[in-house]
Amino acid sequence: MKRTHYCGELTRELVGKKVVLKGWADNRRDHGKLIFIDMRDNSGLVQVVCDFESNPEALEVADSVRSEYVLEITGTVRERSPENVNPDLKTGEIEVDCEDINVLNTSKTPPFFINENVDVDENIRLKYRYLDLRRPSMQNNIYLRHKITKLVRDFLDENGFIEVETPMLTKSTPEGARDFLVPSRLHEGSFYALPQSPQLFKQLLMASGVEKYFQIARCFRDEDLRADRQPEFSQIDIEMSFFEQEEFMKLMENMVSKLFKEVLGIELTKPFPRITYQEAMDRYGSDSPDLRYGLELHDVSDLVKDAEFKVFRETVASEGQVKGIAVPQGQEFSRKEIDDLTEFVKEFGAKGLAWMVLEEEEIKSPIAKFFSDEELDGIIDRMGANTGDLLLFVADEPEIVADSLSKLREHLANKLDLIPSNEYQLTWVIDFPLMEYDKDEGRYKALHHPFTSPYEDDLEKYENEPEKIRAKAYDLVLNGVEIGGGSMRIHQKELQEKMFEFLGIPLEEAKQKFGFLFEAFEYGTPPHGGIAFGLDRLVMLFTGSQSIRDVIAFPKTANASCLMTEAPAKVDENQLKELHLKTTK
């Protein structure tokens, strides 16, 4: 029979109406001549009552039903008695009087209950992902992912963008993460690479006259995994020709605002704040700052460069930094808690943590005696500190100071419960450095990628201050998480060649990897740029999920394996032979 309603749709307005439901047996309770079945589909759950007095045949079938049996039930909606109303259930005011029950499929006893209140090891959930996805929270995540994707498509379509698919089998051009390689059977010894992003193809689409492009792109990176990374992921990829950076950022603000309004019912204030990369690093120690709370970093290097405290003085003399955080009313921290904070920053390379407590009559600190009153007053004033505050300092190389204090800032905000719930702070971080120096490789590397356009007025700094060349790059940050990153692109062959020269990549090597792009630039490629939003991360933030694996239907584990399909797996020797490959293990 044709399904007439979904379980979660049944309300008091349908009392007396005959319905046909299809779904799973969530739970079964036997009360002798009455059997109750909680029936579930992706809309919700409803209670079905099988009564021996009115329908002994249906009761006999119901007696055989177990959890996760697939059922078709015909019955009449009726009101529950007042004492049996379940206020915690959307359909809690009604139930279905079963007239006919048909078992469409049986089920083995599941390895875990399909229930939100049951704590299940994640590896078990991933092994039986098809069961895990039946849970309402996972159904909600998958639905919201679909809704977000549809809203993005609709918005971009309304603004003149067209969706274009780019190749999945392409050329390996490693400059960053490792590529996933695919051997070619027809071209012995040659390999395709799965795309890390559609970067080159979307630029070629701009050269092709496709002025407004987008794609929900699948991307692949063979890198060491972290909690918020997957070897394969999706991004909302957008590129546009003939526009100014500010114009494009405003368009993206409108798109993100639409998502917040339609998905969360939240009206965002526009325009979003702008903060330069340098300001973000100076104030927060991070290029993805969380602006929902204070605890800003303060540079006191100039105030302590002549202090008697040797650690601070020598750090500044060796071109290091001394920065601190003022913790409001931190005088309540015990010495053990401060020692724990010291151990915490050591995890990020800091050698230690100096501290001062501002008491009513004095400064309590093992290092206070090494500073003059003038130096102490300067530190307190610079940090905006008040009586009762705890001042925490790290003295080290600028990179270590930034990393350790940004992590400490976040740690303290959580410890002190300073992060407001249900608040969303979006900001653009702009004017990134074009390059950063890689000590291991002994050369400069692109901070984003080598196709990012520099501010042309900054190019004169290449000889003496290459790290000060700014990029026309912009990241969108939400609550301390980068959700999108983009830039204006280089569209002229000469500037692109110069960029590779800056990066220490020989021109011949660059042409061997990217010659097709250089050639396209010789045929009138327009000015263009774009952005990519991490779809998985965006859905994770919208749903409040703790793991990115909870917003992907079939994710990989931390070691890039699939517990359900047991991928990756060894393949047949004949397959390897056809590909002209041999394995060493």
UniProtKB/Swiss-Prot annotation:
<protein>
    <recommendedName>
        <fullName>Aspartate--tRNA(Asp/Asn) ligase</fullName>
        <ecNumber>6.1.1.23</ecNumber>
    </recommendedName>
</protein>
<feature type="binding site">
    <location>
        <position position="448"/>
    </location>
    <ligand>
        <name>L-aspartate</name>
    </ligand>
</feature>
<dbReference type="GO" id="GO:0140096">
    <property type="term" value="F:catalytic activity, acting on a protein"/>
</dbReference>
<dbReference type="InterPro" id="IPR047090">
    <property type="entry name" value="AspRS_core"/>
</dbReference>
<comment type="subunit">
    <text>Homodimer.</text>
</comment>
<dbReference type="GO" id="GO:0005737">
    <property type="term" value="C:cytoplasm"/>
</dbReference>
<dbReference type="InterPro" id="IPR004365">
    <property type="entry name" value="NA-bd_OB_tRNA"/>
</dbReference>
<dbReference type="InterPro" id="IPR006195">
    <property type="entry name" value="aa-tRNA-synth_II"/>
</dbReference>
<dbReference type="InterPro" id="IPR012340">
    <property type="entry name" value="NA-bd_OB-fold"/>
</dbReference>
<keyword id="KW-0963">Cytoplasm</keyword>
<feature type="binding site">
    <location>
        <position position="221"/>
    </location>
    <ligand>
        <name>L-aspartate</name>
    </ligand>
</feature>
<dbReference type="GO" id="GO:0050560">
    <property type="term" value="F:aspartate-tRNA(Asn) ligase activity"/>
</dbReference>
<dbReference type="GO" id="GO:0016740">
    <property type="term" value="F:transferase activity"/>
</dbReference>
<feature type="binding site">
    <location>
        <begin position="534"/>
        <end position="537"/>
    </location>
    <ligand>
        <name>ATP</name>
    </ligand>
</feature>
<feature type="binding site">
    <location>
        <position position="230"/>
    </location>
    <ligand>
        <name>ATP</name>
    </ligand>
</feature>
<dbReference type="InterPro" id="IPR004524">
    <property type="entry name" value="Asp-tRNA-ligase_1"/>
</dbReference>
<feature type="binding site">
    <location>
        <position position="482"/>
    </location>
    <ligand>
        <name>ATP</name>
    </ligand>
</feature>
<dbReference type="GO" id="GO:0003676">
    <property type="term" value="F:nucleic acid binding"/>
</dbReference>
<feature type="region of interest" description="Aspartate">
    <location>
        <begin position="199"/>
        <end position="202"/>
    </location>
</feature>
<keyword id="KW-0030">Aminoacyl-tRNA synthetase</keyword>
<dbReference type="InterPro" id="IPR047089">
    <property type="entry name" value="Asp-tRNA-ligase_1_N"/>
</dbReference>
<dbReference type="GO" id="GO:0004815">
    <property type="term" value="F:aspartate-tRNA ligase activity"/>
</dbReference>
<feature type="binding site">
    <location>
        <position position="175"/>
    </location>
    <ligand>
        <name>L-aspartate</name>
    </ligand>
</feature>
<dbReference type="Pfam" id="PF00152">
    <property type="entry name" value="tRNA-synt_2"/>
</dbReference>
<comment type="function">
    <text>Aspartyl-tRNA synthetase with relaxed tRNA specificity since it is able to aspartylate not only its cognate tRNA(Asp) but also tRNA(Asn). Reaction proceeds in two steps: L-aspartate is first activated by ATP to form Asp-AMP and then transferred to the acceptor end of tRNA(Asp/Asn).</text>
</comment>
<keyword id="KW-0436">Ligase</keyword>
<keyword id="KW-0067">ATP-binding</keyword>
<dbReference type="Pfam" id="PF02938">
    <property type="entry name" value="GAD"/>
</dbReference>
<dbReference type="Pfam" id="PF01336">
    <property type="entry name" value="tRNA_anti-codon"/>
</dbReference>
<dbReference type="InterPro" id="IPR045864">
    <property type="entry name" value="aa-tRNA-synth_II/BPL/LPL"/>
</dbReference>
<feature type="binding site">
    <location>
        <position position="489"/>
    </location>
    <ligand>
        <name>L-aspartate</name>
    </ligand>
</feature>
<keyword id="KW-0547">Nucleotide-binding</keyword>
<feature type="site" description="Important for tRNA non-discrimination">
    <location>
        <position position="31"/>
    </location>
</feature>
<dbReference type="GO" id="GO:0006422">
    <property type="term" value="P:aspartyl-tRNA aminoacylation"/>
</dbReference>
<dbReference type="InterPro" id="IPR004364">
    <property type="entry name" value="Aa-tRNA-synt_II"/>
</dbReference>
<dbReference type="GO" id="GO:0005524">
    <property type="term" value="F:ATP binding"/>
</dbReference>
<dbReference type="InterPro" id="IPR004115">
    <property type="entry name" value="GAD-like_sf"/>
</dbReference>
<dbReference type="InterPro" id="IPR002312">
    <property type="entry name" value="Asp/Asn-tRNA-synth_IIb"/>
</dbReference>
<dbReference type="InterPro" id="IPR029351">
    <property type="entry name" value="GAD_dom"/>
</dbReference>
<keyword id="KW-0648">Protein biosynthesis</keyword>
<feature type="binding site">
    <location>
        <begin position="221"/>
        <end position="223"/>
    </location>
    <ligand>
        <name>ATP</name>
    </ligand>
</feature>
<comment type="similarity">
    <text>Belongs to the class-II aminoacyl-tRNA synthetase family. Type 1 subfamily.</text>
</comment>
